[in-house]
C-alpha cells in the first residue's frame, strides 16, 4: 500500500531529509525561490479549510440555472487539496506524497505544516493565484455562471468574474470539485458554447 511504501522508504533511508536542498523551482523567469509563496498558500489554505469544513464538506451543493440546467456538486475531504494546488509530503525530502485528505485534516487540527513539506501541484505561478481566491471560493453563493470547459481535463466550470471551480463528473451524474482558477467564467469557457446564468444555489445533505 501507499502507507507501507512510505514506511519502507523511511526505514531504508533512516528517515533522513533533504533539508539542505533549497526550494528552487524553474519557471519562465528561471529559478525561483517560492518559500514565501508556499507560506502564503498554506496560510490561506488553513483559513479556507475551516470554511470548507463549515460550509461544504459532506454536503451537496445544487446549482439551478435560468435555462433549467441543474447540477449537484459533492464536496469530500479529499477534494480540498486539489483546490489549494498543493501536494503534501511525509517529510522535507518529498519522496513520499501523502493522500490529499491528509493536508485538509492536518490544517483542521491546527498542525504546523512546514513549507518544505508541500510543493505546487502543476505550474508554480498558479499557486499564488489559487491562494488569492481560495477563501472567497469557499462561498458557493457567489457562483453566478456555469460554462462548458475549454480545458479537456475539466468538464464544467462554476464561478464568477474573478474565480471558477473546475468540475469533474461522477458516474452517477453528480459533479465534484477538481480545481480552482483565478479566471473569469468567460476566460475558461469553451469557444462557441452557451453561458448558463445561475438562478439559485442550494445546500443539501448527501
PLM regions with names:
Residues 2-152:
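An acidic, glycine-rich, mixed-charge low-complexity segment common to nucleic-acid enzymes
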Residues 123-206:
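Conserved binding-pocket/active-site segment within a compact domain
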